[in-house]
């Protein structure tokens, strides 16, 4: 009875969402999470590999599409505006994840999209003064130097 309040449970119940298992795994730095039923009887375990697979499925890591990461102040975060910009470019947000950088307290907003070509979307975010810290996808636009170089080479071939 004396130690009852000093120990925290390092298990999840079978009815809990898998994110609770991820939280327990991180808190106790363990790769195996016990799963108990309503009577607190052990019904199984969840291993680190199973958690990683579940996190991959949950985050859409296996889905095809571009990823854009924005950085902003918490007070500037507006999901409806971000969604409006994305949808105005003909894209759909498949997954959106928000983390806070401990050093800067800025939000990192990671957006997983349903399309790969994102050059116009990158330009739209820049037009609305969003700070883009990362993106991966296909870009179809060319910069002026490439265009001018190609025109010069075509001219010299004539």
Where are these regions (language model features)?
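Residue-level signal for the start and early helices of compact helical domains
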Residues: 3, 9, 27, 37, ...
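A conserved regulatory-domain signal marking ACT and ACT-like small-molecule sensing domains
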Residues: 55, 65-158
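Short hydrophobic beta-strand motif reused across regulatory alpha/beta modules
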Residues: 43-51
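Short N-terminal helix-initiation segments at or just after the protein's N-terminus
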Residues: 6-17, 50-59, 143-152
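Bateman/CBS regulatory modules and CBS-like beta-alpha motifs in cytosolic regions of diverse proteins
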Residues: 1-30, 35-38, 42-43, 62-63, ...
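A conserved hydrophobic position in a structured secondary element of the catalytic/binding core
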Residues: 13, 46-47, 113
